[in-house]
Amino acid sequence: MLSKNVHTTDVVIVGAGPVGLFAVFQAGMLEMKCHVVDALDCIGGQCVTLYPDKPIYDIPAYPVITAAELIEQLKQQSAPFDTVYHLGQQVIGCKIDNDMITITTSAEQVICAKSLIIAAGCGAFKYKRLTLDNIEAFENKTVFYSVKDKNKFINKKVVIAGGGDSAIDWTLLLSDVAEVIYLVHRRENFRCAPHSLNQIKKLAECGKVQMIVPYQLAKLTGENGLLQEVLVTNFDGGAQTLPADYLLAFFGLAADLGPIHKWGLKTDLRRIEVNSITYETTIPGIYAIGDVASYPGKLKLILTGFAEAATAMSHCYQRVFGKKMHFQYSTVKGVLRS
């Protein structure tokens, strides 16, 4: 008899973001049992932890959908299938014996499966924090590295620091609720979509956004964690004091594959190299899909990850059942719903 912390299934999916959730659906459609492991304590990955209110425009049939809404739809889509989730757990070990893959989690759960799919996005991530004096007093009170509720910033003075897509996108998204936004970047050039930057410049013309370039953060002033002013300086010795209720710093993520690095997989710049036809890694039975997968011509899009999930799962079917999958359209097969 198996211990309560030992499980046997057909497929293990590491990562419960959008691509991992669609892989769950694909497994269910092929009548494969599935366990999912994610280091976060909730389903949704970066979509719910980093940018739940951020609009996504390139999901087919949805002219626009927020990241949180997309995750909710994917959860509903995969709900009919009896999937087991192990949340708040990291995969710390992986062994292969007689074509059976056995993983161990940080919560001492042991899962045995014929196939393993890594849909871990950019891996475990941490925000690149500010190094200003006394920053700890303001963090998670009036200084944030992500936005979970845009309503917090209604009629507030907001300083946004950064020059990439996240800084630009959140400037656009908060411009309709904030009193004013100060966009601070140490360079005059931004690393973002030209269309988005043009929108920022139009907002600057009407006073909703003030572009503070080339400047960088120098000092925060406030009491009891409540921000009052942000001092910014440039390389010529110039300085400005910006009145502020909140500071949002978007300097990117420090990503790490964590223990996956020790599995013997071939990696390339924190991504896992795969066969571009099956998405199998250099270890048979282990696949990688979504942003973590690397192959020539790769497009880092959620849509691409969905297609990779379908292909990888069909290949898993052959390992699980020992026979080639008989392809059926979902319109023929259907999905049983309670």
From Swiss-Prot:
InterPro entries: FAD/NAD-bd_sf, FAD/NAD-binding_dom, Fd--NADP_Rdtase_type_2, Ferredoxin-NADP_redctase_2. One of its GO terms (molecular function) is NADP binding. Gene3D superfamilies: FAD/NAD(P)-binding domain. Keywords: FAD, Flavoprotein, NADP, Oxidoreductase. It comes from Orientia tsutsugamushi (strain Ikeda). Homodimer. It comes from the Bacteria. Its cofactor is FAD. Belongs to the ferredoxin--NADP reductase type 2 family. Its EC number is 1.18.1.2. It catalyses: 2 reduced [2Fe-2S]-[ferredoxin] + NADP(+) + H(+) = 2 oxidized [2Fe-2S]-[ferredoxin] + NADPH. The lineage of its organism: Bacteria, Pseudomonadati, Pseudomonadota, Alphaproteobacteria, Rickettsiales. HAMAP family: FENR2 (MF_01685). This is Ferredoxin--NADP reductase. Binds 1 FAD per subunit. FAD binds at residues 38, 46, 51, 91, 125, 291, 331.
